[in-house]
Structure formats: C-alpha cells, structure tokens
Amino acid sequence: MKIRPLHERVVVRRKEEETKTAGGIVLPGNAAEKPSQGEVLAVGEGRILDNGDVRPLAVKVGDKVVFGQYAGSTVKIDGEELLIMSESDIFGVIEG
C-alpha cells in the first residue's frame, strides 16, 4: 500500500533506534529513545496560501530530516511504523 499525504504534510520513516549506548551498554527496548531523525518517503503537493496559490514544500522524497521527539502522528502501513507530520514540524535537512 502507498500513502499520499495531503497539502503540507510529509511521511517520514524514523531512523532505527539505538540499542547500545556510546559506552557499549545494551539498552532494553523500552529504555531506548526514539530517534528524532528519519527519511522522507512522501510529500504533499504544498501549502495552500491565502490567495489560493500553492507553495511547494522545501523537503523532497529521500531527504534525511531532523524533527522534534514528539512530532507527527504514528501510523502503521503494511506492518511498518511511519510518521505523518506537517512540514513545519521538521527542523532541518541533513546534508552530506
């Protein structure tokens, strides 16, 4: 199944959780922090401005992005957990 977000929404696959600390300690599943980075899988057509024009989104499919820990809504599609969030919930794009 494919999902197409509407307007200024973006679908993001969250980066895998870290299961080890930098010091090598293995974390149990409930202790691992959810990463606040991910990959953009789909984008909406853009924000509808007051004059009716559509402003395209600044992010595109494939971008690696940083967002707030509690940003977006989690949905499960074909057994995979994805986030649907507004473009304004994204803090920046990781380049390089």
Swiss-Prot record:
Listed InterPro entries: Chaperonin_GroES (IPR020818), Chaperonin_GroES_sf (IPR037124), Chaprnonin_Cpn10_CS (IPR018369), GroES-like_sf (IPR011032)
Membrane among keywords: no
Subcellular location: Cytoplasm
Gene Ontology MF annotations: ATP binding; metal ion binding; protein folding chaperone; protein-folding chaperone binding; unfolded protein binding
SUPFAM superfamilies (alphabetical): GroES-like (SSF50129)
Superkingdom, taxonomy of origin: Bacteria
Keywords on record: Chaperone, Cytoplasm
GO CC terms, sorted: cytoplasm
Membrane spanning residue stretches: none
One Pfam family from the record: Cpn10
A Gene Ontology biological process term: chaperone cofactor-dependent protein refolding
Family named by the database record: Belongs to the GroES chaperonin family.
UniProt function note: Together with the chaperonin GroEL, plays an essential role in assisting protein folding. The GroEL-GroES system forms a nano-cage that allows encapsulation of the non-native substrate proteins and provides a physical environment optimized to promote and accelerate protein folding. GroES binds to the apical surface of the GroEL ring, thereby capping the opening of the GroEL channel.
Known partners and oligomeric status: Heptamer of 7 subunits arranged in a ring. Interacts with the chaperonin GroEL.
Name by which UniProt lists this protein: Co-chaperonin GroES
Lineage, opening ranks: Bacteria, Pseudomonadati, Pseudomonadota, Gammaproteobacteria, Oceanospirillales
